């Protein structure tokens, strides 16, 4: 997901650069080709609209960056909560001497999708818990 965010940021930067170039080129063309023509007011109005569009675009970029940062923070928080929950589950299993049953195919598929979407989650915790293997107290203390 971060690669997609970086790609979008690069696209926004390129679009910003393209807008700057277009504005410069239009101003140059108006000065050179139409110094006293009747169409000059229209060209100026277009340039003002281009500036307004650029301002709105920059505001959108700023909001996009804010959303991106918040999204990363939320993802980190979810991963931390999930890791803590899995550790608590392991401790509860240890205290009650219970083991998880093996997962169904559907549950395994969901687990794999979760791992692929949230790589920050400690795979050791998820793998061992979801596979139903018993975890020793030493592993729990190490946070595995």
Swiss-Prot record:
It is found in: Cytoplasm, Cytoskeleton, Spindle; Chromosome, Centromere, Kinetochore; Cytoplasm, Cytoskeleton, Microtubule organizing center, Centrosome. GO terms for biological process: attachment of mitotic spindle microtubules to kinetochore; cell division; chromosome segregation; establishment of meiotic spindle orientation; mitotic cell cycle; mitotic metaphase chromosome alignment; mitotic sister chromatid segregation; regulation of microtubule polymerization or depolymerization. The keyword Cytoplasm applies. The keyword Disulfide bond does not apply. It comes from the Eukaryota. InterPro entries: Ska2, Ska2_N. GO terms for molecular function: microtubule binding. Keywords: Cell cycle, Cell division, Centromere, Chromosome, Cytoplasm, Cytoskeleton, Kinetochore, Microtubule, Mitosis. GO terms for cellular component: centrosome; cytoplasm; kinetochore; meiotic spindle; outer kinetochore; SKA complex; spindle microtubule. Gene3D superfamilies: 6.10.250.1380. Its main location: cytoplasm. PANTHER family: SPINDLE AND KINETOCHORE-ASSOCIATED PROTEIN 2 (PTHR32017:SF3). Component of the SKA complex, a microtubule plus end-binding complex of the outer kinetochore that stabilizes spindle microtubule-kinetochore attachments, promotes alignment of chromosomes at the mitotic spindle equator (chromosome congression) and assists suppression of the spindle assembly checkpoint. Kinetochores, consisting of a centromere-associated inner segment and a microtubule-contacting outer segment, play a crucial role in chromosome segregation by mediating the physical connection between centromeric DNA and spindle microtubules. Component of the SKA complex, composed of SKA1, SKA2 and SKA3. The SKA complex is a homodimer organized around a central W-shaped coiled-coil structure, formed by the interacting domains of SKA1, SKA2, and SKA3, each end of the 'W' is extended further by the C-terminal microtubule-binding domains of SKA1 and SKA3; the complex forms extended structures on microtubules. May interact with NR3C1; the relevance of such interaction remains unclear in vivo. Interacts with the MIS12 complex subunit DSN1. Belongs to the SKA2 family. This is SKA complex subunit 2. It comes from Rattus norvegicus. The lineage of its organism: Eukaryota, Metazoa, Chordata, Craniata, Vertebrata. The gene is Ska2.
């Amino acid at each position: 997901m971060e690669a997609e965010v970086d790609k979008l940021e690069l696209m926004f930067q390129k679009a910003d650069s393209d807008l700057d170039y277009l504005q410069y080129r239009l101003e140059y063309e108006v000065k050179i080709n139409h110094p006293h023509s009747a169409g000059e007011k229209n060209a100026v109005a277009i340039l003002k609209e281009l500036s307004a569009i650029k301002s709105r675009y920059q505001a959108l970029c700023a909001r996009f960056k804010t959303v991106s940062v918040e999204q990363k923070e939320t993802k980190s928080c979810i991963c931390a909560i999930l890791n803590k929950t899995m550790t608590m589950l392991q401790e509860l299993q240890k205290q009650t001497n219970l083991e998880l049953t093996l997962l169904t195919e559907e549950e395994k598929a969901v687990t794999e999708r979760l791992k692929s979407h949230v790589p920050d989650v400690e795979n050791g915790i998820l793998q061992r818990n979801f596979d139903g293997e018993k975890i020793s107290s030493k592993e729990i203390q190490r946070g595995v």
